[in-house]
Every structure is written in C-alpha cells, then in structure tokens.
A protein has these predicted regions:
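Midchain, well-structured core segments that form catalytic/ion-binding scaffolds
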Residues: 1-133, 163
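Solvent-exposed, charged/polar functional surfaces in cytosolic regulatory/catalytic domains
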Residues: 87, 145-148, 177-184
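Short amphipathic alpha-helices in soluble, non-transmembrane regions
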Residues: 137-147
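An extended, acidic, His-containing surface patch that forms the Zn2+-binding/catalytic region
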Residues: 158-192
Length: 192
C-alpha cells in the first residue's frame, strides 16, 4: 500500500484480470543459450518450460591427517564425491532425453583444509527436462548411483530432494499462431 501511495496511485481503482478473456500471455525473451544463434534463427517458439529437479548428495567419511593416513585405510569423502560425479557423467547420457541438461553447481568439503582428508563432502546436483518420464529415469539413476556408492564404500552416501517441479507445456494453438507468424515475417529463420 505504501508503494502505491508513493507512486501517487492511492484511490485509483484496481483493475482485475478476467481469466475467461485470455488464452495465454506472451513474453518476449532474449535467448540465454546458443540454440537460435547457432542455427542462424531469428525466432524461436517456446514449446515448454522445463522442470528443475535438484538433489543434495552427502558423503560421510573419516576426517584425518593427509600426511600420515595410509591410502589403503582412508575414508575420503572428497574422493567418494568425485567418483559419484564421474558416474553421473557416464550414466546420465544413457538415460537422458534430447533436451536434458544437468549440472553439479555446488560442492563443499569439510573441513576444507589442504592437509586434512575430508570427512564430509556435499554436492548439489540439478537436472532439467520437459518430459516427466525422462525426469523419473534421471532420478532413478541418482538413486541407483547412491546405492552403488554405498555398496562400493568406504564412505556412506545419502541424498535428499531439494527441488522438484513439473514441466509446463505451452498451449498448442498459441505455438501454431506464432509459428505461422514466423513463416510470414521470418521465413526460414524461425523454429519451434
């Protein structure tokens, strides 16, 4: 209310959107990736908004002195995390979809000192797709890889879901209208 007053709009009646009058909304967007540019296209018709599924994966080992603990008896959580990341890169291409992407965008290790074997390592794994079956396959692969890490040892691995939303498929009639407009105003330079 204060912002409305500060803008000089106090007392101005509020206008409400009547949902029955609208099929959808359009949003002009600057491409954040390189797909349109790499294909020399001017217009891209959005078909969906991908879901983002995110997991925190934790490895528990034993913190110890890096200079005196023999390699054969180490329980290095950092090494366990590195192996897990490698397995993600090997396995995800086998189960992903054409548009799937994944990222390990955050890693932390405790205590985070160069001369101490990490006793705990944590990562955030995120993947995105617009197909629920693909998302479920990727999640099942995470579950399998955590079980595999626990079976291999020597560290204990656990995981928890931190974000899981649904893909949003765009209205087909709006896509078709935009596609038709692209054919007129950007022939050969547009795509869905």
């Amino acid at each position: 209310r204060q912002a409305i007053a500060d803008a000089g709009l106090s007392g101005v009646p509020r206008h409400r959107v009547e949902p029955a009058r609208y099929v959808g909304m359009l949003e002009a967007h600057i491409e954040q990736g390189d797909w349109l540019e790499s294909q020399d296209l001017h217009i891209g018709v959005v078909t969906s908004i991908v879901a983002i599924w995110q997991y925190k994966i934790v490895f528990e080992g034993v913190q110890n002195h890096a200079g005196t603990t023999r390699m054969a008896i180490r329980k290095d959580a950092g090494v366990a995390l590195r192996r897990f990341c490698q397995r993600v890169e090997e396995r995800f291409p086998e189960v992903c979809g054409e548009r799937s992407v994944w990222t390990v965008g955050q890693i932390s290790m405790e205590p985070g000192a160069p001369s101490i074997i990490p006793g705990r390592a944590e990562m955030i794994l995120q993947f995105r797709d617009d197909d629920m079956e693909t998302l479920l396959r990727l999640e099942a692969t995470v579950r399998e890889l955590v079980a595999e890490a626990n079976a291999a040892g020597p560290c204990k691995a656990s995981w928890e879901t931190t974000n899981q939303n649904k893909p949003a498929l765009m209205d087909q009639s709006i896509q078709s209208a935009l596609d038709a407009g692209g054919a007129v105003y950007a022939p050969g330079k547009h795509a869905r």
